[in-house]
Regions:
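Accessory carbohydrate-binding/adhesion or oligomerization-edge regions at the termini
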Residues: 1-37, 115, 121, 141, ...
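Short flexible loop/turn segments that cap and initiate beta-strands
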Residues: 197-202, 244-251, 588-590, 594-605, ...
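Extended acidic/polar, glycine-enriched regions
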Residues: 105-109, 186-278, 622, 648
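Beta-strand-rich structural segments
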Residues: 185-188, 254-255, 583-587, 635, ...
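Active-site-adjacent substrate/metal-binding segments within catalytic domains
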Residues: 33-57, 61-70, 74-81, 87-90, ...
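Substrate-binding/catalytic cleft of secreted carbohydrate-active enzymes
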Residues: 317-319, 327-550, 563-574, 580
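Accessory beta-strand-rich segments of carbohydrate-active enzymes
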Residues: 3-5, 12-17, 42, 46-157, ...
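Short S/T/G/P-enriched beta-strand
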Residues: 555-582, 588, 643-677, 683-686, ...
Length: 742
């Protein structure tokens, strides 16, 4: 069995800004970014950096292999042991592996160095210069590193095996319904021994610890240095099927037996499910047609960039689910396996993607894109959540020959009818199109499915994608667009929510089978001096009004393990003197009653108009006669009974700070570090948020955690936020905040 040594701690790091000006070594743990990021992507660092650590391995059995697994390293990486270069890797979003067997001696302390370069490189996807890019890349070893010790007779690693359509363990659902299911298990076995080895391969599927299906191959003999694929089928009766509403997962245990002894074993989670895409039949999961609401996500987190540990990735997935979304497009690059695991567990359907945005380079770049497509499928093929593979460069002109290579790579790597490639040019299995491009109602190509990849942003920001991204020429009026920070006030937040209301209604009236609004979180970008404020949550994951609109589109009966749903109601106003007297209430209830200072203002049903008629739950609209300070209370009713309640109170003078640590009850596992946002809310004597407050707040920590970035922060819309890094093993840390006069 493989012995995995996690190498996330005890690294030494330095930046090499020039050949003669290396910075001093500093001790760091992974995941790590080589710089503290500002919120807008303006103060990025680019250059060479090095990670070094001591590596000492115990005595090994004969012919064992020792393989270094790097989760991701931005952009290019050189691997050295004791100063000797062993490998170079190009590509910053996918894992790579290096066989260190011949470089490591038993019991000897070796020096492992990874030298990274995150500078612009037109040959490495995404290829486009950072200063022209509508997102950010960062740098460093921003995912985990492991040393995997493989026995002589072993199951290979999917990435490094280099097998088209194979390598490692590949599981596919061949058929599935409520009565039965058939799963294919393809296992790649290699004999690194100097003598032939005889073995059998066993595959077990377990549900809640109980074996629900098992298969054992006949005995095979493998010559020295040879490898073979063993493919078997497992039958399940009355299977637990994976779906967004019920994301049932099995544990697949794959074992190699020599006689009665297990010599290697792998365990992974797997969902039994079948997806389908067609214009006539829509998007189906296990034969059931679903019309899922979705979003787009960039994987960055403030201050730390891409260096988000497991718990932070899971929190983002939970935020997406709780925002009312059951589908997410990973824009525009492969994202963390931890995030993918969370989507598996929470029931979030995923459009996976290779790196690319508005750029297509030369032959070397295109070869790298095809290799990225292959490696992406090999990495993510066993994830239940992945329904679509964007093996295409987003919003990029591509030749027919290049697109044919990308499409073919997907089908070669994942044979059968469950591979659905997609792209913004109609050359793939599924056509993905953005609402601003104007064809979501008119496009048709036989029975091919259409997915609205993006909506709710660009169509309100610029007339089309042809505006000048450098000068801003052609951008529509700011008041009408969807790009609004929380601090811009109530009118801006209402406008964003209204835009999304209209846009979602329009996409639901189209023949599209899935849709994804742009975007779930605000994000930094290279080409613009300010971060993009198009998220339904800001960059610190604080909600805007539009977040609650999407929450309201989920039915009141929906809830699940690991996330909160159910009946909800939200009054979309700050209820201050300048507030609009027409008040929208977002709710998934049948009726809503609004009261002001205890006086009923009416009980209404949803406001169904030509702009809301296709929504599952249109907003409720109340026209108030005048402003009166105090408390607005909305009560939602289902079946005549109160099901949800929300109150908004006119803010008075700031009185105190309230601190919240945004963990969402998701904790790091033992031995893991964490990154979490901490918010200080400026509230009045009644606890109402003072949305106009912009006070400076000073944060202090105790107990071993550290603030990443500034400790003195100006509040936006009454909330000041910082990012805290928590080292592995630190559990009892404290945070305090103070502001003048509070």
């Amino acid at each position: 069995m493989p012995f995995v040594t996690t190498l996330d701690r005890d690294w030494e790091f330095r930046r090499c800004d020039a050949a003669s000006a290396e910075t001093a070594w500093a001790r760091v743990d992974l995941p790590h970014s080589p710089f503290v990021a500002d919120l807008d992507g303006r103060e990025h660092w680019f250059g060479l950096c090095e990670y070094s650590r001591q590596l000492q391995v115990p005595r090994s059995a004969q012919h064992e292999r020792r393989v270094l697994h790097v989760g991701a390293a931005m952009h290019t990486a050189t691997v050295l042991v004791d100063g000797r270069e062993l490998a170079r890797h190009e590509g910053g979003y996918l894992p790579f592996e290096v066989d260190l067997t011949d470089a490591l001696a038993d019991g000897v302390a070796h020096t492992l160095v990874l030298r990274l370069d995150n500078r612009d490189n037109a040959d490495v996807p995404p290829g486009k210069p950072y200063a022209e890019l509508d997102f950010c890349w960062y740098g460093g070893l921003y995912r985990g590193v492991e040393l995997r010790t493989l026995p002589a007779l072993h199951i290979t690693e999917a990435i490094s095996a280099g097998e088209v359509g194979g390598g490692g363990v590949s599981l596919r659902t061949l058929a599935a319904d409520a009565a039965s299911a058939t799963v294919s298990a393809k296992v790649h076995v290699r004999n690194a021994d100097a003598v032939p080895r005889r073995f059998r391969v066993q595959v077990e599927l377990l549900r809640d610890g109980l074996i629900v299906s098992s298969v054992l191959s006949g005995q095979r003999e493998l010559a020295p240095g040879a490898a073979v694929h063993i493919e078997q089928e497992l039958a399940l009766t009355k299977p637990a099927l994976w779906s967004p509403a019920s994301p049932a997962l099995h544990e697949a245990v794959v074992s190699i037996f020599e006689g009665e002894q297990v010599v290697d074993e792998r365990a992974l989670r797997f969902g039994v499910r079948r997806f389908g895409f067609s214009r006539s039949g829509g998007f189906t999961v296990n034969g059931e047609r679903l019309r899922l609401r979705g979003t787009n996500r960039h994987q960055e987190f403030p201050r730390v960039g891409y260096a988000m540990p497991r718990a932070a990735q899971w929190r983002d997935a939970r935020r997406i689910k709780e925002a009312g979304f059951d589908y997410v497009r990973l824009s525009h690059y492969p994202q963390s396996p931890d995030f993918m695991d969370a989507c598996d567990a929470l029931g979030i359907v995923v459009m996976d993607a290779i790196p690319g945005w508005q750029f297509c380079g030369g032959e070397k770049f295109q070869d790298a894109c095809v290799e990225n497509a292959r490696q992406l499928v090999r990495r993510d093929r066993n994830h239940a959540c992945v329904a679509l593979w964007e093996l295409s460069l987003n919003e990029t002109p591509m030749s027919e020959a290049f697109m044919a290579r990308l499409h073919a790579a997907g089908h070669e790597e994942y044979p059968g009818d469950q591979m659905a490639t997609c792209g913004w040019i109609d050359r793939f299995d599924v056509f993905i199109h953005s609402r601003q491009h104007g064809q979501i109602h008119t496009w048709r190509n036989g029975d091919k499915a259409l997915v609205v990849a993006e909506y709710g942003d660009w169509e309100f920001y610029a007339a089309n994608e042809g505006f000048d991204q450098t000068t801003g020429a052609g951008v529509l009026a700011a008041w009408a667009n969807s790009r609004h920070f929380r601090g811009e006030g109530e009118r801006a937040l209402r406008q964003q929510a209204q835009n999304h209301t209209v846009a979602l209604d329009d996409t639901l009236a189209s023949p599209a089978v899935l849709d994804g609004q742009w975007t779930v979180f605000d994000y930094a970008r290279g080409y613009h001096p300010l971060r993009a404020a198009c998220g339904v949550m800001d960059i610190f994951r604080l909600p805007k009004f539009s977040y609650h609109f999407y929450r309201s589109q989920r039915d009141a009966a929906e809830c699940g393990a690991g996330w909160s749903g159910g009946a909800m109601v939200f009054v979309a106003t700050h209820w201050a003197e300048a507030s609009a007297l027409r008040v929208s209430v977002f709710s998934n209830c049948e009726e809503v009653e609004l009261s002001l200072n205890g006086r009923p203002l009416g009980r209404k049903k949803p406001d169904v108009t030509w702009r809301t008629q296709h929504l599952p739950h249109p907003p409720f609209v109340f026209d108030l006669p005048r402003f009166e300070p105090g408390e607005l209370v909305a009560v939602g009713y289902v079946g005549g009974a109160e099901a949800a309640r929300h109150a908004v109170r006119t803010p008075e003078a700031p009185a105190r700070l309230e601190i919240a640590i945004d963990t969402l009850d998701v904790a790091p596992a033992d031995g893991e570090r964490d990154v979490v946002a901490v918010h200080a809310r400026i509230v009045d004597a009644h606890g109402a948020l003072c949305v106009a407050a912009e006070d400076e707040v000073t944060f202090t920590l105790a107990g071993g955690a550290e603030i990443v970035g500034p400790a003195v922060v100006k509040a936006e819309a009454g909330i000041a936020s910082i990012v805290v890094r928590v080292p592995a093993g630190v559990t009892d840390w404290q945070v305090a905040a103070h502001a003048a006069g509070l």
